């Protein structure tokens, strides 16, 4: 094992000198043992001449001094993978941070892996059922696809993510991996405790590199989570759900690292390698003939500017977008998904079938018409509308309420049992409302129920 000596430390950037001919490869991991016995992992980023490498630290560089010895591991950062990591919380280098002792996994993967080869990819466009009505009907997720989850603070991103993890774990016996990238430590802590309470933790691996950590950790933690998910896909042939919260922080950390390495900034001060870094991550998230990694990525939009290079680069990779709206949350409709703003590439009759497609378009049409009429209603009131428009408004309001659904993970707050709604029941319910079969039922019957049969039964309790 080659050893070098630390020659310079500037924040998270550490230069190490090696003997001639012993330079580590780019992306190789080095370990430094501090005076208190703790180990620090560094990742090679640049070769500076014949004998010096510049590296980025995965933790704080407190306690490092010039002249310290750094050992080259000869390979990139390795993280534990397999079923042993389920129910555990790890950091970027795969060390447990949940106080439950070491992770006794038999296998480890490098965090830098090549994307699957072209001939290994599955070309079949297939829908991924989530059991959440508004998503399955209007912006269906594709198996092995990438979905962007947009929303401000407090509109229900985390609850939606937890419900997806719960549904995949219980209905499809699937595993989930959650990568917390540069978000608040408090949110990660809340998620950890809520997952333990709701019982979904045993089917989930959590990897965190939060906003108090150096940029090296934040720029790599998404790759750590992805490697864990890839193991389940490639070795066990499973369909895995990968959550990244927040993909913008991944770009932001890359920008910090780039500046520290002295690269010339690109548009809006971002790194010149922005699209390459995003592409390397997103290209690995895909379906193969063995299994799939389906990802849901929360995306923070800086200053609500969708043309900012960071969200704009992420958009090019997405198959579907789920937009959470504060206006809908204010109506008390949860999940607060905006049915008109959210999109999906597979909302296509050739993929999902004519029945599903026609129902989804009819729902969007009636909601759009209701939206157009809202100004008239606000100024003149309902009485000024034609009879046809009154009927449209009545049905649209029922549709809007029927898009809400009680969640398993929110049972403690709503007092209602959670519901997983199968796609055929979702389509059947909305078709009946639009066809006018339930015009005689009050709006309240459709609020926070699962299937249309439950709405009909609820009338008796009102």
Swiss-Prot record:
UniProt subunit comment: F-type ATPases have 2 components, CF(1) - the catalytic core - and CF(0) - the membrane proton channel. CF(1) has five subunits: alpha(3), beta(3), gamma(1), delta(1), epsilon(1). CF(0) has three main subunits: a(1), b(2) and c(9-12). The alpha and beta chains form an alternating ring which encloses part of the gamma chain. CF(1) is attached to CF(0) by a central stalk formed by the gamma and epsilon chains, while a peripheral stalk is formed by the delta and b chains.
Protein purpose: Produces ATP from ADP in the presence of a proton gradient across the membrane. The catalytic sites are hosted primarily by the beta subunits.
Keyword flag Transcription regulation: no
EC number: 7.1.2.2
Main location: membrane
This protein's UniProt keywords: ATP synthesis, ATP-binding, Cell inner membrane, Cell membrane, CF(1), Hydrogen ion transport, Ion transport, Membrane, Nucleotide-binding, Translocase, Transport
Compartmental location: Cell inner membrane
Residues engaged in binding ATP: 151-158
Protein known as: ATP synthase subunit beta
EC top class, as a word: translocase
Database matches in CDD domains: ATP-synt_F1_beta_C, ATP-synt_F1_beta_N, F1-ATPase_beta_CD
Known catalytic reactions: ATP + H2O + 4 H(+)(in) = ADP + phosphate + 5 H(+)(out)
Membrane topology type: Peripheral membrane protein
GO MF annotation terms: ATP binding; ATP hydrolysis activity; proton-transporting ATP synthase activity, rotational mechanism
GO terms for cellular component: plasma membrane; proton-transporting ATP synthase complex
